[in-house]
Amino acid sequence: MTLLEMIQKENAAAFTHGGKFHADDVFSAALLLHFNPKLTIQRGNRVPEEFDGIVFDIGRGEYDHHQKDSRIRENGAPYAAFGLLWEALGTEILSPKMAECFDEKFVQPLDNNDNTGEKNELAGLIGMFNPVWDDNRRSDAAFFEAVTIAGRILEHKWERFRADERMEQQLSLIHISEPTRLQ
């Protein structure tokens, strides 16, 4: 079964780490929910043995980058969970060319932040959704609040990339190449 089929099946479920969250797991969850808003996402410190679903950013599986042999892109940028999921699903949302461009301009900076601590303003803003020490909110509630915002950001960003592609197509009709990107 492909990842997309797993996401879209009835009663689909996903699991990620609990506690403090980062842009990586938040955008990963938002990406999965794009394909199935009814997907149930559970958080915890350990993947339950009986769990039958998509596991990301924990568990040392296909969509977890916390392992010795974690993958690195050809340009040297390390994958985090969001990048691994985007690699599998990006062309379901954008054309191959635009999916690659989106990876380079949007996903890789978030993956770099998660892997190296490199400063990233968006990652910092998402991190601010984590409850402070004296906040009575549960971490899970804050996580899903951040996921909702991340989902809206993704939708708007994808539309910008689609608009760029439409612009390139229109400009190619009048033989202008390489327009200035507005991203």
Question: Can you annotate each of these PLM segments?
Answer:
Residues 106, 110, 150, 170-171:
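Generic structural signal of hydrophobic/aromatic residues within well-ordered alpha-helices
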Residues 140-145, 149, 153, 157:
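Long, charge-rich alpha-helical interaction segments
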Residues 161-165:
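Charge-rich, low-complexity N-terminal segments
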